[in-house]
């Protein structure tokens, strides 16, 4: 997927929701693994690199999109950027204390192979963390899945199940930790305010990259119909989403 096309607006998501639960979980892993050298694979615009850099000696970010990497500002002397693929991981063996992926594993072509390669890069006692969306949502609803045809099917095709992720970690020789929910995302929009919501804009998320223009427009049309139907009753349509981000962790023994 061409993330360079949305790099200019990508960080808007963190202004809306800074994902403090994810930050807390990552800081906890840094502490638990006594990590000094970190690698984020699929680092995008470097949000988590900049968040964790003050706590460690070195943070390396790898991403395949040069457009996203060019958005990383104020690197400082603790952050290193590498334009490359999760399919190769061009780093020395046993060179990191913590490797983490936030909302990116579903983009990797060889997900199991990535986990195997990551295990080789970990120092003894180090950890691999995969954080991502629970698809389909275990609780509540998703406006995107409810209104946009093909969105749920597309995400199901690219997000591996959490049991699968855990089995890949175990097969790679990692000691699998209990799966944790690290973030609850809840929001509610009333009436026409939903049409201005960042996350339903055409470039608001990668899920829409998997939809045709006609599928995307069909979703917008459905939302408009729901708004109009509520207004005809003298009411205001209510759009709710409640999602979870989970974290799978494997420790190098």
Regions found by a protein language model. Give the residues of each.
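A short glycine-rich, Lys/Arg-flanked "PGG" loop and its adjoining helix->strand segment in the class I
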Residues: 112-124
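Conserved Class I S-adenosyl-L-methionine
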Residues: 45, 176-253
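Conserved class I S-adenosyl-L-methionine
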Residues: 1-34, 47-51, 68-71, 127-157
């Amino acid at each position: 997927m061409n993330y360079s096309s949305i790099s200019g607006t990508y960080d808007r998501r963190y202004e809306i929701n800074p994902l403090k639960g994810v930050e807390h979980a990552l800081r906890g892993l840094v502490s638990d693994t006594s990590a000094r050298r970190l690698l984020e694979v699929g680092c995008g615009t470097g949000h988590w690199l900049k968040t964790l850099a003050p706590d460690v000696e070195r943070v390396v970010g790898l991403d395949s999109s040069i457009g996203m990497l060019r958005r990383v500002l104020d690197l400082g002397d603790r952050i290193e950027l590498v334009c490359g693929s999760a399919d190769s991981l061009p780093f020395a063996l046993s060179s990191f204390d913590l490797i983490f992926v936030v909302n990116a594993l579903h983009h990797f072509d060889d997900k199991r192979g990535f986990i195997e390669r990551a295990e080789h890069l970990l120092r003894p006692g180090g950890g691999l963390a995969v954080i991502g969306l629970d698809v389909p949502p275990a609780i509540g609803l998703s406006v995107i899945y409810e209104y946009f045809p093909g969105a749920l099917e597309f995400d199901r095709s690219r997000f591996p199940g959490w049991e699968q992720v855990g089995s890949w970690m175990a097969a790679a020789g990692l000691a699998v930790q209990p799966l944790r929910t690290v973030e609850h995302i809840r929001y509610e929009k009333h009436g026409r305010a939903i049409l201005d919501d960042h996350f339903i804009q055409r470039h608001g998320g990668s899920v829409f990259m998997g939809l045709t223009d006609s599928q995307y427009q069909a979703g917008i049309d459905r939302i408009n119909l729901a708004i109009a139907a509520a207004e005809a009753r003298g009411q205001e349509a209510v759009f709710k989403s409640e999602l979870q981000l989970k974290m799978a962790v494997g420790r190098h023994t």
